A protein has these predicted regions:
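Short, acidic/small-residue loops that bind anionic groups at enzyme active sites
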Residues: 86-107, 189-208
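Short, well-structured alpha-helical segments in soluble
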Residues: 54-69, 157-171
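Conserved beta-strand elements of the Class I
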Residues: 6-8, 111-114
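Periplasmic-binding protein-like
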Residues: 7-8, 70-76, 172-179
């Protein structure tokens, strides 16, 4: 049976889900795990508040319990439900924010985050504190745009370019797109600011592929013994 990586968008936005799928599509290739992208139908339109963040943990757990996969990605850049979901599966579970931070630190000493809203900042700061890397953050700039504006092919781009350039001026050597709704704007933002721009769902897929393919190698070695 083909290996499967399941990306779960915890919000109910179809445009956000479609953007995630398009962003990770280049990572699908013969011989690699299949990438499936789904959304939580009963989820909020976006993960904005702490209530959204905490409330979505149980629906995420239920989906992981009923959907078999070789790895899971919780496709929101505040990593909601990460600890809870890890208790209901023995498969690897990835948070895009943590994966993006790891990727950013491989590209430079300091990074910046373009956040979804002001309310995103405390949740992302908590994750950075848990990772012990808060001092590597050059700054965070929120866009404060609605999800459906953020996922529009053109509407948020002037603001994204402005925010990315401001983060570079603050000392960022790479920039993280701090919402999965920004997934379709990575190339544009990188061209605008001149430093590496990390799309977190792509970073998480790269780590998930590594985990799944490594496990494949372990199984083949055990079978040969």
């Amino acid at each position: 049976m083909a290996e499967r990586i399941l990306l779960i968008n915890p919000n109910s936005s179809q445009s956000c889900t479609d953007g995630i799928a398009a962003a990770v599509a280049p990572y699908a290739a013969p011989g690699l795990p299949r990438l499936d992208v789904v959304k939580i139908e009963e989820g909020p339109p976006a993960i904005v508040t702490w209530r959204d963040w905490y409330g979505i943990a149980e629906p995420l757990c239920r989906m992981v319990e009923r959907e078999a996969a070789d790895a899971y990605i919780l496709a929101c850049v505040s990593d909601p439900g990460l600890e809870a979901v890890r208790t209901v599966t023995d498969r690897p579970v990835f948070g895009p924010l943590r994966c993006a931070v790891a990727a950013a630190m491989m590209r430079g000493e300091r990074f910046g985050i373009i956040a979804f809203t002001d309310k995103s900042k405390p949740r992302q700061r908590r994750a950075l504190q848990a990772m012990g890397v808060e001092t590597r953050l050059a700054g965070t700039i929120p866009l404060n745009l609605d999800m459906e504006v953020l996922t529009d092919p053109l509407a948020p781009r002037a603001r994204l370019a402005e925010a990315a350039k401001e983060l570079v001026a603050m000392g960022a050597e790479s920039v993280i797109l701090g919402c999965a709704g920004m997934a379709g704007h990575r190339n544009f933002t990188e061209d605008a600011c001149g430093v590496p721009v990390i799309e977190p769902c792509q970073a998480a897929v790269a780590q998930a592929i590594l985990a799944v393919v490594s496990a494949r190698g372990d199984r083949m070695r055990i079978a040969a013994e």
